[in-house]
C-alpha cells in the first residue's frame, strides 16, 4: 500500500490499506494513511471520518487536526476549518503550515488583517519571503475555489514585505 501511495497510485494504495484495516481496525496510523489516500482522491467526507476517529482516540491528535482543518477548508466548511486551525496555532509550537492555512481560512472569512498576521508568522517560520510565496502559490487554486479574488491573491504576499 505504501509503495502504491508513494507512486501516486492512490486507488491501488487504498485497496491495500483497506485489506490491512480488516486485520488492524484499531491502528490510528493506518487510519491516518487511509484518510490521506482518500484526501488525495478528493473523497473528503470519507477522509474526515477517519481523521475524526484519530483525533478522538489519539493522545497527540495534531496530524489529524491538520487534515480535518484542510478537508473542512476544501469542502467549504470554513467555520470548522477555523476551529481546527485555531486549535493548532494555540499549541506550544505550531508549524509553518498551521499558520499559513489559518491565514487562508481567515482570508476566505474576510478577516484580512488576521490573515496577514498569520501569513507573517508563516513567513517567519519559513525563513524567507520568496520561499513563503512559493508555498503560497501552491495553494492559490484552492483559495480561488473557495471564493478568493485572484487579484487579491497576487497583492496579499506584498503586504508581508
Predicted features, each with a name:
Residues 125-161:
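Terminal, low-structured helical/coil segments at or just beyond the last alpha-helical repeat
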Residues 19-22, 52-56, 86-90, 123-124:
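Conserved structural position within tetratricopeptide repeats
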Amino acid at each position: 500500500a505504501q509503495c502504491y501511495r508513494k507512486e501516486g497510485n492512490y486507488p491501488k494504495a487504498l485497496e491495500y490499506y483497506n485489506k490491512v484495516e480488516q486485520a488492524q481496525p484499531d491502528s490510528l496510523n493506518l487510519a491516518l494513511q487511509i484518510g490521506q489516500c482518500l484526501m488525495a482522491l478528493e473523497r473528503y467526507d470519507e477522509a474526515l471520518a477517519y481523521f475524526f476517529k484519530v483525533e478522538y482516540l489519539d493522545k497527540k491528535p495534531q496530524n489529524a487536526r491538520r487534515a480535518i482543518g484542510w478537508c473542512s477548508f476544501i469542502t467549504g466548511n470554513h467555520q470548522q476549518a477555523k476551529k481546527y486551525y485555531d486549535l493548532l496555532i494555540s499549541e506550544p509550537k505550531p508549524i509553518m503550515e498551521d499558520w499559513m492555512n489559518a491565514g487562508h481560512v481567515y482570508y476566505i472569512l474576510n478577516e484580512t488583517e488576521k490573515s496577514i498576521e498569520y501569513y507573517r508568522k508563516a513567513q517567519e517560520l519559513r525563513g524567507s519571503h520568496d520561499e513563503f510565496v512559493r508555498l503560497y502559490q501552491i495553494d492559490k487554486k484552492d483559495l480561488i475555489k473557495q471564493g478568493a479574488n485572484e487579484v487579491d491573491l497576487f497583492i496579499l504576499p506584498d503586504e508581508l514585505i
